[in-house]
């Protein structure tokens, strides 16, 4: 019973991250999708951000799909792609093409992957 609830919790975390990756980077190269997942994982590890994925993703003013409700709609319908799911799994397993970056944007500075700049 305990392992079932743990597995369900892990699936919930994976689905939440896959949904965010799809919303933020679904039209980007696979490496860019993993990089968005890595930003979330980096924030969880950072003392400057909350300690859980849910708190990081839904922190006020951080990820627009979380604020607009788009993320929740995608998640409710499992509307993310297989690539977004795989990117989430890879990021959760430690894949990180961006080092210690905590942000990404379409303008400004940083390491470019697809249309996003990671910094």
Regions inferred by a protein language model and the residue ranges of each:
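Bacterial extracytoplasmic/cell-wall-associated proteins, especially those involved in peptidoglycan
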Residues: 10, 14-119
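Single conserved hydrophobic/aromatic residue that forms the stacking wall/gate
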Residues: 1-9, 13
């Amino acid at each position: 019973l305990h392992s079932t609830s743990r597995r369900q919790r892990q699936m919930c975390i994976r689905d939440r991250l896959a949904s965010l990756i799809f919303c933020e980077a679904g039209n980007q190269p696979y490496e860019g999708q993993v990089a968005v997942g890595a930003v979330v994982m980096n924030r969880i590890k950072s003392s400057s951000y909350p300690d859980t994925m849910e708190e990081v993703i839904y922190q006020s003013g951080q990820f627009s799909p979380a604020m607009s409700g788009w993320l929740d709609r995608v998640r409710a319908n499992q509307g993310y792609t297989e690539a977004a799911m795989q990117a989430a799994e890879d990021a959760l397993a430690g894949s990180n093409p961006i080092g210690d970056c905590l942000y990404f944007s379409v303008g400004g500075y940083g390491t470019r992957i697809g249309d996003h700049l990671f910094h």
